[in-house]
Amino acid sequence: ITQTKDNGNLFDIDAQNVGLLETLKVKNHSFGLGYQQIIGESAYPLPDGFLPETYFINWNTTGFFKQDEKSYHFIYGYDFKDYVPGLNTTFKYVYGDHFKTADGLKNKESEANVIVNYALQQPFLKGLALQYIFINYDVKHGNDFSENRFFVNYSKKF
């Protein structure tokens, strides 16, 4: 059962997203470090539901968009092009804090991702790629979850 209360503030939104994500590439390695903060009197609005929002510094399953939330982003990637052409991996960890639950409890959350991409190299399979994503989400007050996602991607230049 869901209860709602009409307080006349249906579109009273006050939220700004401030963030910076920098990436350093050294040979086959990439290192990323980022910070994002939601400022205002409400959570950051997501007009499309929760799709990957391009104005956040980093794509995450859970978003890190809650009112007053501060999140810290750490990314490491490796391109195996010298050993297995077409294979690359990314490891992401995000920690968010300084936000509260609907009941007013101080909360924190974290998300870890392992992403493996492989673009098939055979000429007759050109444009075909496979992707695996493992997602682990932990939250102090709420529901933790883990997901395994598999994708088959095909791209063609016209």
Whereabouts are the PLM-identified features?
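Transmembrane beta-strands of outer-membrane beta-barrel proteins
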Residues: 20, 29-33, 74, 87-91, ...
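A conserved active-site cap/scaffold subdomain adjacent to cofactor or substrate pockets
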Residues: 2-25, 32-34
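C-terminal structural cap/anchor segments
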Residues: 38-104, 111-114
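Transmembrane beta-strands of outer-membrane beta-barrel pores
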Residues: 1-5, 26-28, 35-41, 70, ...
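Outer-membrane beta-barrel domain signature
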Residues: 5-11, 60-65, 100-107, 138-143
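Residues that define the transmembrane beta-barrel architecture of outer-membrane proteins
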Residues: 14-18, 68-72, 106-112, 144-148
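C-terminal structured domain segments
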Residues: 102-136
